[in-house]
């Protein structure tokens, strides 16, 4: 192997290690709880954290269970959004939790980084509003009377604190060594796009006060959207993600569309550096599990249909008996009694 080839291989290895380590903190989702953390030494034992995240853990012990919850939210939402796709956001019990898929600069990695940073921002924000954290509470900057005439009151979600903590904790790996590399730029951009998906969908919730249900006085507060809405928004961004490449702009490096005919991406869009594999066949070297054995929809022409999901390999059909409740009746007072029925259904799985 030539010296140039050796150098290129070394760079690819460093790139893979860097990219994997950046998302290893998601392993916190595998823990049942980190709420029992009471000593700083425990932070050293949390699997998947880099040293600067360990230091943040020691300074913010009470927040770490919210970080764990945010990681769980991210994984669950990813699996929901991609449940009918060839890549269905499967996780492993090892590092990184999404396998080697996230070490590549693909659309899938872009979504994982975006939904993960959003998960932490969301969970920490909700913990603030619930009074679970001493360092933060409701957003007291929202007060007075709005231009629409209602009174700002109640507990507005402190999204500023949640976003700031997500930036400090999630972005720390990219903002250290190699922060100007193309993959670091991609990760940082998608992390921020995830947080903006919450910010742009913040809601105003209100309550009426008055005699007999009238609305003489209306008090309102700002609230984060349901996380499912954040997931839907980021899935749309995934479908319209922009392929980019690094380019020097002035004295710094930036990501620009690879195709000059495409419009420049915004801060809310997802970006990726390389095309995705087709995810059809198992390839453990690249972290692809394949679609063999996956359940498919025989009548669908979309990606969840047997033709596309099974990549043209065909599918098996089996008749399966399912047990379900039927003939339910309400009995006074107060319970519902049902019979157990068997139903025969057709199941289709990819060859």
UniProtKB/Swiss-Prot annotation:
<comment type="subunit">
    <text>Interacts with PORCN. Interacts with PKD1.</text>
</comment>
<dbReference type="GO" id="GO:0035567">
    <property type="term" value="P:non-canonical Wnt signaling pathway"/>
</dbReference>
<dbReference type="InterPro" id="IPR018161">
    <property type="entry name" value="Wnt_CS"/>
</dbReference>
<dbReference type="GO" id="GO:0072034">
    <property type="term" value="P:renal vesicle induction"/>
</dbReference>
<dbReference type="GO" id="GO:0035239">
    <property type="term" value="P:tube morphogenesis"/>
</dbReference>
<dbReference type="GO" id="GO:0097190">
    <property type="term" value="P:apoptotic signaling pathway"/>
</dbReference>
<dbReference type="GO" id="GO:0005109">
    <property type="term" value="F:frizzled binding"/>
</dbReference>
<dbReference type="GO" id="GO:0072273">
    <property type="term" value="P:metanephric nephron morphogenesis"/>
</dbReference>
<feature type="disulfide bond">
    <location>
        <begin position="206"/>
        <end position="220"/>
    </location>
</feature>
<keyword id="KW-0272">Extracellular matrix</keyword>
<dbReference type="GO" id="GO:0061045">
    <property type="term" value="P:negative regulation of wound healing"/>
</dbReference>
<dbReference type="GO" id="GO:0032967">
    <property type="term" value="P:positive regulation of collagen biosynthetic process"/>
</dbReference>
<dbReference type="GO" id="GO:0022407">
    <property type="term" value="P:regulation of cell-cell adhesion"/>
</dbReference>
<dbReference type="GO" id="GO:0005737">
    <property type="term" value="C:cytoplasm"/>
</dbReference>
<dbReference type="GO" id="GO:0032526">
    <property type="term" value="P:response to retinoic acid"/>
</dbReference>
<dbReference type="GO" id="GO:0007548">
    <property type="term" value="P:sex differentiation"/>
</dbReference>
<dbReference type="GO" id="GO:0030336">
    <property type="term" value="P:negative regulation of cell migration"/>
</dbReference>
<dbReference type="GO" id="GO:0048599">
    <property type="term" value="P:oocyte development"/>
</dbReference>
<feature type="glycosylation site" description="N-linked (GlcNAc...) asparagine">
    <location>
        <position position="88"/>
    </location>
</feature>
<dbReference type="GO" id="GO:0001656">
    <property type="term" value="P:metanephros development"/>
</dbReference>
<dbReference type="GO" id="GO:2001234">
    <property type="term" value="P:negative regulation of apoptotic signaling pathway"/>
</dbReference>
<dbReference type="GO" id="GO:0071560">
    <property type="term" value="P:cellular response to transforming growth factor beta stimulus"/>
</dbReference>
<dbReference type="GO" id="GO:0030182">
    <property type="term" value="P:neuron differentiation"/>
</dbReference>
<dbReference type="GO" id="GO:0045596">
    <property type="term" value="P:negative regulation of cell differentiation"/>
</dbReference>
<dbReference type="GO" id="GO:0072164">
    <property type="term" value="P:mesonephric tubule development"/>
</dbReference>
<dbReference type="InterPro" id="IPR043158">
    <property type="entry name" value="Wnt_C"/>
</dbReference>
<dbReference type="GO" id="GO:0071392">
    <property type="term" value="P:cellular response to estradiol stimulus"/>
</dbReference>
<feature type="disulfide bond">
    <location>
        <begin position="333"/>
        <end position="334"/>
    </location>
</feature>
<feature type="disulfide bond">
    <location>
        <begin position="78"/>
        <end position="89"/>
    </location>
</feature>
<dbReference type="GO" id="GO:0060993">
    <property type="term" value="P:kidney morphogenesis"/>
</dbReference>
<dbReference type="GO" id="GO:0030501">
    <property type="term" value="P:positive regulation of bone mineralization"/>
</dbReference>
<dbReference type="GO" id="GO:0008584">
    <property type="term" value="P:male gonad development"/>
</dbReference>
<dbReference type="GO" id="GO:0032355">
    <property type="term" value="P:response to estradiol"/>
</dbReference>
<dbReference type="GO" id="GO:0051894">
    <property type="term" value="P:positive regulation of focal adhesion assembly"/>
</dbReference>
<keyword id="KW-0217">Developmental protein</keyword>
<dbReference type="GO" id="GO:0003714">
    <property type="term" value="F:transcription corepressor activity"/>
</dbReference>
<dbReference type="GO" id="GO:0140013">
    <property type="term" value="P:meiotic nuclear division"/>
</dbReference>
<dbReference type="GO" id="GO:0001889">
    <property type="term" value="P:liver development"/>
</dbReference>
<dbReference type="GO" id="GO:0060126">
    <property type="term" value="P:somatotropin secreting cell differentiation"/>
</dbReference>
<dbReference type="GO" id="GO:0060748">
    <property type="term" value="P:tertiary branching involved in mammary gland duct morphogenesis"/>
</dbReference>
<dbReference type="GO" id="GO:0045669">
    <property type="term" value="P:positive regulation of osteoblast differentiation"/>
</dbReference>
<dbReference type="GO" id="GO:0045165">
    <property type="term" value="P:cell fate commitment"/>
</dbReference>
